[in-house]
Regions:
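Intrinsically disordered, low-complexity segments enriched in small residues
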Residues: 1-239
Length: 239
């Protein structure tokens, strides 16, 4: 979607609706839906602080749960846990989140689990040295940009998350694409000559960030990396 928007020179799409109501989708039994909604909302208010803490840390609370159950995407899904996973677990993200109030993504959501980081100073790319607001990360971003690529530095995840949002790149897609390229590199399918001097090993933060910027600029190996895994497989197999 980001590529389509860029090519059409579209910055954003704004949708207007008359208003937000509980029966926007013309439910069959509105009273029953409202009753269940009241019950679910009450359970969330009473239990969330003691269990998932979604209102405090959002979906990032899943990091340690997935790691404990050997389900955390690690090194392009080769593993399900890692000894350094605590470096990017929910306690770490709680220390970064600065907006303590619930910040829902939709009007009326009682969970309001979206979080953000204020005044974060960017270190690379076109916004280097500037302080910005970074949305999230949610679990999918923390795991996709983090453990799946062998990255256990929260600051790398935050900066990559910011630039993906800024460039119009899906964090999940980029995390998976990068992990695929990293495994190809470590297995000898890719090398510095093919990547334009980048060493795409698991956990190599500087080169991973540089590749993301090259994708956004449409430069060198970034032109290939930005095409997604399906096309990359074809290119790597042929060449």
């Amino acid at each position: 979607i980001g590529t389509v928007f860029r090519n059409k020179r579209i910055k954003a799409v704004v949708c207007k609706i008359p208003g937000v109501k509980g029966n926007l989708n013309n439910v069959v039994d509105l009273e029953a839906i409202q009753e269940r909604g009241r019950r679910f909302n009450r359970e969330m208010r009473e239990l969330d602080d003691k269990q998932c803490r979604m209102r405090q840390v959002g979906t990032a609370h899943l990091m340690e749960i997935m790691d404990d159950h050997d389900l955390l995407p690690t090194h392009n899904y080769k593993f399900g846990s890692h000894k350094d996973a605590p470096k990017i677990d929910s306690a770490v993200w709680t220390s970064f989140f600065t907006q303590g109030i619930p910040d829902g993504c939709w009007i009326g959501c009682n969970m309001a689990c979206a979080k953000a980081i204020d005044d974060y100073e960017i270190t690379t790319g076109p916004y280097a040295g500037q302080k910005v607001i970074v949305d999230g990360p949610e679990y999918e971003t923390a795991a996709g940009l983090g453990s799946n690529g062998g990255f256990f530095d929260p600051r790398y995840i935050i900066e990559t998350n910011f630039y993906c949002d800024t460039y119009g790149i899906c964090t999940i897609t980029w995390g998976t694409s990068l992990a695929f390229m990293q495994e190809c590199y470590e297995n000898g399918i890719l090398n510095k000559e093919r990547t334009g001097g980048l060493e795409l090993k698991f956990g190599n933060i500087p080169d991973a960030l540089e590749l993301l910027h090259r994708v956004a600029r449409g430069e060198g190996f970034g032109l290939i990396a930005g095409q997604g895994i399906r096309r990359m497989k074809k290119i790597f197999a042929e060449k």
